[in-house]
């Protein structure tokens, strides 16, 4: 949890926003997945947002669903995902690592056991995509017991009550949704979210990172100009993996070429 605090403090000092890539653990296989994550960090990623393969990913569009299918095809299991997380943490001691999960994966392990395992391997935050704020108590309580930041999604139509709850319960960062719907780079991020950012600040929420539909440097800049602390990009990155699925070296080069200008756009 503290890794987010020190990251945001460092970025503020350098007058930069955060660029956070999302990938699915184990896509397209464990070994290449680790190389992908190393490449993202070398290219300038400030934090990681990682998914674990799940059979029914409701919030995800086709690009990330395909990533899950590739990971399943490679035989990736939840237990292996935790092994991979431990390896990432060992190699990269300071980078914040966030998980994007679905509730069933947490229930399968047992809520407390799941967060205990997260703490053990060095995960900093968990966002459970299909658990609304009002049903989040058992998750966020277990998270805090194990020093893991509970992350909440702030939708573009959030009312004042929801904004207050997100500010009060969330830690680490706030996932600011560019638009409603499922993930995907095809639908570009919509209107600037200045009013939401202002309210979240007023209620002392964790720093907002804007996600969904972020696929170009100008959108990263726009998110930061609107007051967000940074931007999360998933589908655009996962698409690069898909496009170069049979050319591992080309894939890593293309990922690097994508991340560098995205990170550069965070510098004012």
Swiss-Prot record:
GO cellular component, one term: cytosol
Active site: 49 (proton acceptor), 60 (proton acceptor)
Alphabetically ordered keywords of this record: Amino-acid biosynthesis, Aromatic amino acid biosynthesis, Lyase, Tryptophan biosynthesis
One Gene Ontology molecular-function label: tryptophan synthase activity
Pathway: Amino-acid biosynthesis; L-tryptophan biosynthesis; L-tryptophan from chorismate: step 5/5
Claim: Amino-acid biosynthesis is one of the keywords in the record: yes
Enzyme Commission designation: 4.2.1.20
Pfam families the record matches: Trp_syntA
Name of the top EC class for this enzyme: lyase
Coiled coil regions in record: none
Catalytic activity, reaction form: (1S,2R)-1-C-(indol-3-yl)glycerol 3-phosphate + L-serine = D-glyceraldehyde 3-phosphate + L-tryptophan + H2O
Domain of life: Bacteria
CDD domains, alphabetized: Tryptophan_synthase_alpha
Disulfide-bond pairs as recorded: none
Purpose of the protein: The alpha subunit is responsible for the aldol cleavage of indoleglycerol phosphate to indole and glyceraldehyde 3-phosphate.
Subunit field text: Tetramer of two alpha and two beta chains.
Family statement drawn from the similarity comment of this UniProt entry: Belongs to the TrpA family.
The protein's name: Tryptophan synthase alpha chain
Species in which this protein is naturally found: Escherichia coli O6:K15:H31 (strain 536 / UPEC)
Taxonomic lineage: Bacteria, Pseudomonadati, Pseudomonadota, Gammaproteobacteria, Enterobacterales
Gene: trpA
